[in-house]
Amino acid sequence: MSVETVSDPVPGPGQVLVAPLACGICGSDLHLVESQAAMPDLVPAMVLGHEFVGELLDYGPGTERSFPIGTPVTSVPYLDTGDGPQLVGLSPAVTGGLAERLVLQEKRLLPVSGDIPLRYAAVAEPLAVGVHAVAAADLQPGDAFLVVGCGPVGLSVIACLKAAGLGPVVAADFSPARRALAEQAGADVVVDPALSSPYQSWTQLAGAPVPMSPLMDTPMRANTVVFECVGVPGILATVMDSVPPQTRIVVVGVCQQPDTITPVIGITKELSIRFVFAYRPDEFARALDWIVTGTVDVAPFVTATLPLEAAAEAFDELRQPDKHCKILLLPS
């Protein structure tokens, strides 16, 4: 990783030029840096950063000039280009938010209002992941929730469940610092898996049924929902082993290695497993609204803010889960 001087991007048709004010570092950014270092010939260099807020500087051709110059804005990190759609901060073809200048799509801009510090609007992107995960869970009245893993994704899920008035929520993480953040996010019960079973605490709250054969006449309907927010091999299998029948499992954590499950466990328990990815534009807008209205307080999630020049230090710091959750870099 390096901080370099490059030419400013130029907004094309329907695009705008933005000066990033803050940009968060995502776990996917860490993976990309590690992959590029390990395989420089296969993974091209790119300007990272897809969690951003910035100031509108200029309009490209064919725009409607929807907002005054100087408006604080954010956007889903998706850009239409002559070479097709590109993910901002995740593609070598377009500049990401870890820069002093950034090109975005005018039609996807969202103005940032309210009395919050503008930098917190950069957290709308990871919070939107939680909005989408909760929306995908097929929630029913009386559901009880277990969130496994209290990093940025798990905290977003907890915050979104509570913002929607849902609960009880049990959160589990080995890190004391992240358990403390889970409490601040609104978790009703926080468990250290090294000391006690989060599944026991959760099923007691849920009143989960005693496992029984689906061949019995008694209808089975569980009210247990798990959000797997860790994303490492073995976690999904552990969840499947541990949950009661008919639990809904929402896989939010991004596991990038091969993993193994035993299907018969899911079959005999009639488990429902739903994999989710990112969010929809309306969910991003809802996440931003929850932040600017104070419905969700993301300030505790941000454990450090550093200048862009300290990017390498920030990436190293973020690899310490007991110390940091979300680090924002300030390009401007």
Model-flagged regions — what are they?
Residues 75-148:
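NAD(P)H dinucleotide-binding glycine-rich loop of Rossmann-like/cofactor-binding domains
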Residues 59, 126, 149-152, 254:
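Glycine-rich Rossmann-fold phosphate-binding loop(s) that bind the pyrophosphate
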Residues 147-150, 162-234:
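Adenosine-nucleotide cofactor-binding segment
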Residues 166, 230-293, 331-332:
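Glycine-rich phosphate-binding loop and adjacent beta-alpha segment
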Residues 214, 237, 281-332:
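C-terminal hydrophobic helical "lid"/dimerization subdomain
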Residues 51, 71-72, 101, 132, ...:
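Residue-level marker of beta-strand positions
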Residues 7-23, 37-79, 113-115:
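Glycine-rich beta-strand-centered segment in the early N-terminal region that forms part
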